[in-house]
Amino acid sequence: MINEIKTDAKDRMTKSVDSLKSHMSKIRTGRAQPALLDGIMVEYYGSATPLRQVANVVAEDSRTLAVSVFDRSMIQAVEKAIMTSDLGLNPSSAGTTIRVPLPALTEERRKDLIKLVRAEAEQARVSVRNVRRDCNADLKALLKDKDISEDDDRRAQEEIQKLTDSFVKLVDDLLAAKEKELMEI
């Protein structure tokens, strides 16, 4: 029973950190990253389709993304989708490739992005702590029902606390790395 609770805690905490990584990868830094365009949907034969399914996105250099559209007739639709996204990008097409130059980030925009990243990290920390709280409540219920001893309860709570601390440290490390990346010019 205790092992199931610990395994569940680790799985849920891992999902929280993975979610944070996913959110952080979508936050634009000064560097061109293909993941930046992951959230863009393109109108494809009457339905909204993720950009990744109609085109290949690669970093051409540190400031330019190259989008290779699979179907030539989709070039205008892809270009329009990138332009109308809230990323503030101005793509230009050249044959079957669309080049997306990334403008340099202003100091004000960098600070806004850092605030956003810190809020995301805090949300991940809260999520990890909520998992700990749920697990401790499960342990208390087992203790109350006399399914585990007080020593087992205390030991399990300490192990869950260590797990929580390691995941919170991981969140803090991710935050520090992203802040450093955002402040690079």
UniProtKB/Swiss-Prot annotation:
CDD domains, alphabetized: RRF
Compartments where found: Cytoplasm
Record flagged with keyword Hydrolase: no
Keywords, in A-Z order: Cytoplasm, Protein biosynthesis
Coiled-coil region: none
Domain of life the protein comes from: Bacteria
A Gene Ontology BP annotation from the UniProt entry: cytoplasmic translational termination
GO CC, alphabetical: cytosol
Disulfide pattern: none
Keyword Protein biosynthesis: yes
Job of this protein: Responsible for the release of ribosomes from messenger RNA at the termination of protein biosynthesis. May increase the efficiency of translation by recycling ribosomes from one round of translation to another.
Protein family per UniProt: Belongs to the RRF family.
Protein name: Ribosome-recycling factor
Organism of origin: Tolumonas auensis (strain DSM 9187 / NBRC 110442 / TA 4)
Lineage: Bacteria, Pseudomonadati, Pseudomonadota, Gammaproteobacteria, Aeromonadales
